[in-house]
Design a protein with these regions (language model features):
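Short acidic/glycine- and proline-prone juxtamembrane loop motifs at membrane-interface regions
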Residues: 132-140
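Extracytoplasmic catalytic/substrate-binding loops of multi-pass membrane glycan-assembly enzymes
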Residues: 32-47, 57-75, 82-85
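Membrane-interface starts of transmembrane alpha-helices
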Residues: 12, 82-86, 90, 112-118
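Transmembrane-helix signature of polytopic, membrane-embedded enzymes
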Residues: 102-125, 141-142, 146
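Loop-to-helix entry region of an early transmembrane alpha helix in multi-pass inner-membrane enzymes
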Residues: 67, 80-100
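Transmembrane signal-anchor helices characteristic of membrane glycosylation enzymes that use polyprenol
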Residues: 10-39
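Short, Lys/Arg-rich, polar N-terminal cytosolic tail immediately upstream
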Residues: 1-9
């Protein structure tokens, strides 16, 4: 279990956390806007905006995947408005979260700060950027990985 009091957030760790946060957010934010896959990229966009308009999945419209990502995205649409940037902020923040958890996990197993940084940045590059937008398979994988690492 990751214990942040044991892994004191000193200046080096704080600097690495800032690097990981900025890198993991912006690498996903950048690559998510390079192109789209009509079948996958907009899978949760429409259903999330419909939830925001008061409709409920299954009762009012058909969904092809789980409901978790739709409701999380509806929350982001509520905060940032229904637009592409709100859609991408969701996946970019999720990339930050999982990358930081991976970093602290590597510190917990005493991998070393620099190695943990490099591996966490590598993880951030590969984790959510393959889709760029909220995607049910990636959310499911990472929501299972988070408690495993914690």
């Amino acid at each position: 279990m990751i214990n942040l009091t044991k892994n004191k957030i000193n200046n080096t760790n704080l600097f690495y956390v800032i690097i990981i946060t900025i890198f993991s957010f912006f690498i996903n934010f950048y690559y998510s806007s390079l192109g789209s896959f009509p079948i996958d990229t907009f899978l949760h966009y429409d259903s999330s905006s419909r939830i925001l308009n008061g409709e409920l999945p299954v009762r009012d419209f058909w969904v092809v995947s789980g409901l978790t990502v739709d409701f999380i995205q509806a929350f982001f649409f509520k905060i940032f408005g229904v637009n592409w940037y709100a859609y991408v902020i969701h996946s970019s923040l999720f990339n930050c979260l999982i990358s930081l958890i991976v970093y602290f996990f590597f510190l917990e197993i005493k991998l070393g700060k620099l190695k943990a940084l490099i591996l966490s940045l590598s993880f951030a590059t590969l984790s959510y950027t393959i889709s760029g937008t909220p995607f049910v398979d990636l959310h499911a994988t990472f929501l299972l990985l988070i408690p495993t690492l914690l």
